[in-house]
Amino acid sequence: MEVILLERIAKLGQMGETVKVRDGFARNYLLPLGKALRANAANKARFESERSTLEARNLERKSEAQKVADSLDGKSFIIVRSAGETGQLYGSVAARDIVETLAAEGFNINRNQVDLNQPIKAIGLHKVTLHLHGEVDVAIEINVARSAEEAERQAKGESLTSADAIYGVDEDALKPEDFFNPEAELESEEE
């Protein structure tokens, strides 16, 4: 199906371009959300008559998104979750959790604006991209930890999943002899 784009859409085209897309993408996403019109003679004429208002509205949305991006840029947000000793989460952190955390901080972001290929399943610092507008993206840092104190330690660069953090043992100081001493086993068998 051919459609006329009413705004810039990543990996598809600029506002005003006529592009060919799959029928389902047009019917289920582009047309219901008002991001495109079917490419027929009546809609082409309608688009040309409304082009200046669409461009002004798009510019306004972009400036609003840029303001939000400027306030979010480089910020870190803490999400506290239960996790095992190795840092594996009991569950995961999904886009919905990130949106809730941002909403608690006063940012109104939709779940579909969070670029998260797969849920976060381990504690640590994770970079997440937010697509606020077709031309405005911002990267934020999500600090997933077991507690607020651990989040502060992680932010300072401390690893919470190393042997030292878990068991109080320095990984570099361990020698193979500490794990397996064949002579000690022989001595215990002789006794």
UniProtKB/Swiss-Prot annotation:
Disordered: region residues: 171-191
GO molecular function (one): structural constituent of ribosome
SUPFAM superfamilies referenced in this protein's UniProt entry, alphabetically: L9 N-domain-like (SSF55658), Ribosomal protein L9 C-domain (SSF55653)
Origin superkingdom: Bacteria
GO CC field: ribonucleoprotein complex; ribosome
One Pfam family linked to the record: Ribosomal_L9_N
Sequence similarity: Belongs to the bacterial ribosomal protein bL9 family.
Record PANTHER family: 50S RIBOSOMAL PROTEIN L9
Protein name: Large ribosomal subunit protein bL9
Species for this entry: Rhizobium meliloti (strain 1021)
Gene that this polypeptide is encoded by: rplI
